C-alpha cells in the first residue's frame, strides 16, 4: 500500500498531499482514468468547436467557442502530469515542472469558470431585457472588456498562489495543484470562486425561468380572452353600442386586399363624416401596407354599404384557422350591434388561436425546463471534489472502502468537465431539432427533414429563424 502523506523533501521535489491510501495498482488505475477522461474531453471540445464554428459571427457563439477552446487546452494540461507519472508508481515531480503545470492548470480552471459565467450571464440578459436593440443585446457592447478580463482575472488568481512560498503547488499524483493545507489557499483561490459562481448561476437561471413563465402566462391569458382581445391590444376603449360604431378588425395578414363599394353618391371617406368616438385608425396602425383611406371609420354605416373581402390565396403564412375566413363579407345594413361585434371578435379570436407565435411560445415554455441543466452539471462537477476533500480532512488517513470509491468518482468528475458541458449542448441541440421537426408542417419524411437540417447546420443557417 502507498501512503500519500505530507513529506517535505529536497528542494528539487515537491511535497505530496495526503489524499487516500491506495495500492500501486489503484494509483495506476486512477492515473489511467484521468488520462482517458482528459482525452475524451479533448475530443468533445473539438467537436463542440467544430459544431459552432460555422455560426461564429454571432457573439453568443463566440462566447461558446471561447469556452470550449479553454476546455480543450485545460484537458491537454491535465493529461501531462499523469502521463509522466504513469510509469513510476510513486512519482516525485521536480519543483519547476510541478510549479509550471500547477500554475497553468489553476489559470485554466479559473478561466473555464469565467467563461461559464459569461455564457450564462449573456443568456440571462437576452431573456430579461428583450427590448434592447437586437444586434447589441446582452454583453455585445462589452465584448472587448469580456475577452480582456478572461486573461486578466485568471492570471491574477494564478499569481496570488505564489504568496504561499512554502508549498505553492504540490504533487497530488494525478495533478499538480494547490495544497489542501493550509486551507486558506485552497478556499481563497479555489472553493470561494466555485461557491460564488454556483450561487450566481442559480440566481440567474431562476430569474430567467420566472421571467419566461410570467411572459407565457400573460400571453396565454391574453390569447384565451377573446372578448377582451381588442382591449389588450389597445385598439378600442369599449365595445360598440350601436351599428355605426363597429370598426373593422386588424386581421393579421398584410397581403389582404380591401374593397369598398359605396351605395350612394356620398363617399364614406368624405370630410363631412365624423368618426365614431369608439373607433380608431386600426388598419394603418397594425398594417402599414394598407391604403391611407382605410384607417377612417364611417359614421353613417347604416346608409352606406360596405363590401369587405379578404383573399389569403397568395399568402405564404396561411394557416388552417384562416381558411374559414377567406371570404368574409359585411352587408349593409347590419341587423344588430351584437351580431356585428361578435362576428368581428370571433374572426379575430380564431386567427389568434392559430397564430404560429402561440406555438412558438409553447415551445419556449417547454424548453425553459432545461434551464437548470447547466447549474446541475456545474454543481455536480464542483461539489463532489470539495466533499471529498472535506471528508478526507475530517478523517485523515482513514479514507478506505466507500470513501475511496467516492474519491475516485470525485477525481473522475473533476476531469470530465468538457464532456459534461458538450453532452448538455448535444442533448439540447437534439431536443431543439426534434421539436422543430415535430411542429413543422411538411409532407417530407423525418429522414429528409433531418438531412435538410443537417445541410442548414453545415451552412451555418440552422437556428437563424429561431
From Swiss-Prot:
The UniProt record lists the keyword Nucleotidyltransferase = no
Where are the residues of the annotated region Disordered? 262-337
Which parts pass through the membrane? Answer: 30-50, 65-85, 101-121, 144-164, 192-212, 372-392, 409-429
Q: Where does the record say this protein resides?
A: Membrane
One molecular function GO term is: G protein-coupled receptor activity
Q: Which Pfam families match?
A: Git3
Membrane topology listed for this record: Multi-pass membrane protein
Signal peptide per UniProt? none
Keyword set for this entry? G-protein coupled receptor, Membrane, Receptor, Transducer, Transmembrane, Transmembrane helix
Basic and acidic residues: bias regions: 308-327
- Biological process annotations from GO: adenylate cyclase-activating G protein-coupled receptor signaling pathway; adenylate cyclase-activating glucose-activated G protein-coupled receptor signaling pathway; negative regulation of induction of conjugation with cellular fusion
Say which domain of life the source belongs to. Eukaryota
Does the keyword section mention Glycoprotein? no
UniProt lists compositionally biased (Polar residues) regions at: 292-305
One cellular-component annotation, GO: plasma membrane
Main localisation: membrane
User: What ranges does the record list as Low complexity composition bias?
Assistant: 262-285
Q: What does this protein do?
A: G protein-coupled receptor (GPCR) that senses glucose and signals via the heterotrimeric G protein alpha subunit gpa2 to activate adenylate cyclase and PKA signaling, and suppress sexual development and gluconeogenesis.
Q: Which family does it belong to?
A: Belongs to the G-protein coupled receptor GPR1/git3 family.
Query: Subunit info?
Result: Interacts with G protein alpha subunit gpa2; the interaction is direct and leads to activation of gpa2 upon glucose stimulation.
Which protein is depicted?
Glucose receptor protein git3
Q: What organism is recorded for this protein?
A: Schizosaccharomyces pombe (strain 972 / ATCC 24843)
**Record gene name:** git3
